[in-house]
Each structure stands twice: as structure tokens, then as C-alpha cells.
Curated annotation (Swiss-Prot):
UniProt entry keywords in alphabetical sequence: Disulfide bond, Glycoprotein, Immunity, Membrane, MHC I, Phosphoprotein, Signal, Transmembrane, Transmembrane helix
GO cellular component, one term: phagocytic vesicle membrane
Chain residue ranges for the region called Connecting peptide: 302-310
Name assigned to this protein: BOLA class I histocompatibility antigen, alpha chain BL3-7
Modified residues (Phosphoserine): 355, 358
Organism: Bos taurus (Bovine)
Disulfide-bond pairs as recorded: 128-191, 230-286
Length: 364
């Protein structure tokens, strides 16, 4: 079943007052992640609870307690093949979790001696990463309060790390309830199984590999230095490597590398920049590696061919002028020749009429 069935045992429904809530996943070859947020709003009713699920970088489900009819909803077409039982079951689980978060917010406020008037928030993240062979790489479960770490499941999935003395109270309760074992069983089992299922259902989208469109741009800083920026655009999945090299040697220590960003169309973009001496640009290359490429790309800044362009324009103009002049000369010669023939014909005609009176004169 789905992730949150782990919360079903009532012994685990008590976190601080003993409720067990959920947490994150880091990206591996493929990942399944759930993010929960609960926000108290004194004087405005029940806390708001929002849950979203991601496969890799694609949001595929969402629940919002403030919706007119709160239900888990699909966010991608390939999730619509799930039957009514799936959505009904998960909607019930989310509604239960919203109530757990409501209790947790009150309990944590007491742990930190906070007043009832302020707004507070809980964030939980959990999930699993699998490798290309479909086996578990890592599992995650983290819990935060008011933007700070609170408690997390350790990497071996057998013990907890508490961030402060208040979290130590929760840690002792969860250790007594065997919460770590329950979560380890889920992360190593059901989480991986559901991720495989989602990858199969959405394989046309999730398992595609769109290669990057890459190029290098040139930006002058001063007379002595320039910035070379290597761009990779329109690629999927998110994982990509951009490395500047100087005559084959990596320059990773000196280059500026931004985080991969969504392009807004389901693909990603990224760039890496390096400051180099002016005039030495051709000694530097950018190496691009991505799943969608059959082999890595090696790019170099290509200076615009301005001198050749200007020379071509000049030559073209000269040829045009020469052609115009030649045409004018030929035209003038042609005109002169035509006038000479007209004069000759006219003179011959006058002479013939004078000597031969028998020629018929045309009527006027």
C-alpha cells in the first residue's frame, strides 16, 4: 500500500504526545518523496494541512485541507489510472494526519513555552531513493518545527537524532514505541515498491532522457579578463555535469556553478561560469555530461566571424559598384551606337530618294 499506511498502528499515532509524522528523500537515480506542512492560525479555525508527493522532480499527488472538498488529487495524467479505492484510502490517511499535526502543534507549543497567539508550523519530509537496478539506495524521514530541525531518522534507519532538549522528549517516546523499526520496514519495503509502480505507470514521462542544448557565451569584465559561461538548456532528467577545463585540466575550484533550475516546461537548465584571461579563451573548454547524450559534449567559445563578415560586405559592395559602372558604360555605348545607325539610315534614305524618283512616296 501507500506510504502513509505506516501511520495506521495507533501506538505510532502519538508523536510528541505521541504522534508519528513523516519526512524526506534525497535524489538518487530515482526518488519518491512526500512533503507535509501544517500551519496553525489562531482565531481562524483549524490548522491548514498540505501534502504533496514527488516522483523524481515531478509532483504527482496533492492534498489541501482548505480545498472545498479535501481529497488527494492527481497532478499528472498517468496517476488517473489509479482506482477510487486508492484515492479514498489516501484521503482518509491525509485527514488523519491533519489531525495528528493539529495535536503536534499544540504539544510543541507547550514544549517551547510559546503563547497561544502566534502562528507556528510543522514540516515533515520522507521517502526513498533507488538505483538503476531498482534497489534501495537511501531512506529519509525528517521533521522540523518553525523552520528548524527537530528530529530525524538516522542514515542506518535504526535510531533518531534529536536537535534539542524538546526533541529529546519525542525521541524517548518513539524509541519506546519502536517507531524507527516501523519506518525502516516501510522505507525498505513499501516505499520502494510504490516507487517502482509509479515509474512504470509514468515511464513515458519519468524515464525519458531529453539531451541538453548547450552553448558558450562570452562576457567582457575588463581589458584583461572575460567570463565564459557554459549553458545547458532543455534537458531531463535533472542530473547533469558541467565542468570547465583548461587544456584538459578541471577548473572546478574556480568556476561558478548554479543549481539546476526548472525551465517551466518540464525540462531543466543550468550554467557554469569561469573567469579567464582575455585572449586565452580558446584554451578553455566546457564538458557536458548527461543521460540523454550518447557521449559527453566538449564546447569551446567560438568568436563571431566579424572580420570575415565585414570583408564580405565590402567585397560585395565593390562588386556591385563595378557592375553598376560597367553596366552604365555598356548602356552608354549601346545608346551611342543606336544613334549612329539612325543617322546613317536617315542619310542613306535621303540620298536614295534624290536619285530615284520612281520610288513611291508614302501618303501622309
Amino acid at each position: 500500500m501507500r506510504v502513509m499506511r505506516v501511520m495506521r498502528p495507533r501506538t505510532l499515532l502519538l508523536l510528541l504526545s505521541g504522534v508519528l509524522v513523516l519526512t524526506e528523500t534525497l535524489a538518487g537515480s530515482h526518488s519518491l518523496r512526500y512533503f507535509y506542512t501544517g500551519v496553525s492560525r489562531p482565531g481562524l479555525g483549524e490548522p491548514r494541512f498540505i501534502a504533496v508527493g514527488y516522483v523524481d522532480d515531478t509532483q504527482f499527488v496533492r492534498f489541501d485541507s482548505d480545498a472545498p472538498n479535501p481529497r488527494e488529487e492527481p497532478r499528472v495524467p498517468w496517476m488517473e489510472q489509479e482506482g477510487p479505492e486508492y484515492w479514498d484510502r489516501n484521503t482518509r490517511i491525509y485527514k488523519d494526519t491533519a489531525q495528528i499535526f493539529r495535536v503536534d502543534l499544540n504539544t510543541l507549543r507547550g514544549y517551547y513555552n510559546q503563547s497561544e497567539t502566534g502562528s507556528h508550523n510543522i514540516q515533515a519530509m520522507y521517502g526513498c531513493d533507488v538505483g538503476p537496478d531498482g534497489r534501495l539506495l537511501r531512506g529519509f524521514w525528517q521533521f522540523g518545527y518553525d523552520g528548524r530541525d527537530y528530529i530525524a531518522l538516522n542514515e542506518e534507519l535504526r535510531s533518531w537524532t534529536a536537535a534539542d532538549t524538546a526533541a529529546q522528549i519525542t525521541k524517548r517516546k518513539w524509541e519506546a514505541a519502536g517507531a524507527a523499526e516501523t519506518w525502516r520496514n516501510y522505507l525498505e519495503g513499501e516505499c520502494v515498491e510504490w516507487l517502482r509502480r509509479y515509474l512504470e505507470n509514468g515511464k513515458d514521462t519519468l524515464l525519458r532522457a531529453d539531451p541538453p542544448k548547450a552553448h558558450v557565451t562570452h562576457h567582457s569584465i575588463s581589458d584583461r579578463e572575460v567570463t565564459l559561461r557554459c549553458w545547458a538548456l532543455g534537458f531531463y532528467p535533472e542530473e547533469i555535469s558541467l565542468t570547465w577545463q583548461r587544456e584538459g585540466e578541471d577548473q572546478t575550484q574556480d568556476m561558478e556553478l548554479v543549481e539546476t533550475r526548472p525551465s517551466g516546461d518540464g525540462t531543466f537548465q543550468k550554467w557554469a561560469a569561469l573567469v579567464v584571461p582575455s585572449g586565452e579563451e580558446q584554451r578553455y573548454t566546457c564538458r557536458v555530461q548527461h543521460e540523454g547524450l550518447q557521449e559527453p559534449l566538449t564546447l569551446r567559445w567560438e568568436p563571431p566571424q566579424t572580420s570575415f563578415l565585414i570583408m564580405g560586405i565590402i567585397v560585395g559592395l565593390v562588386l556591385l559598384v563595378v557592375a553598376l559602372v560597367a553596366g552604365a558604360v555598356i548602356w552608354r555605348k549601346k545608346r551611342s551606337g543606336e544613334k549612329g545607325r539612325i543617322y546613317t539610315q536617315a542619310a542613306s534614305s535621303d540620298s536614295a530618294q534624290g536619285s530615284d524618283v520612281s520610288l513611291t512616296v508614302p501618303k501622309v
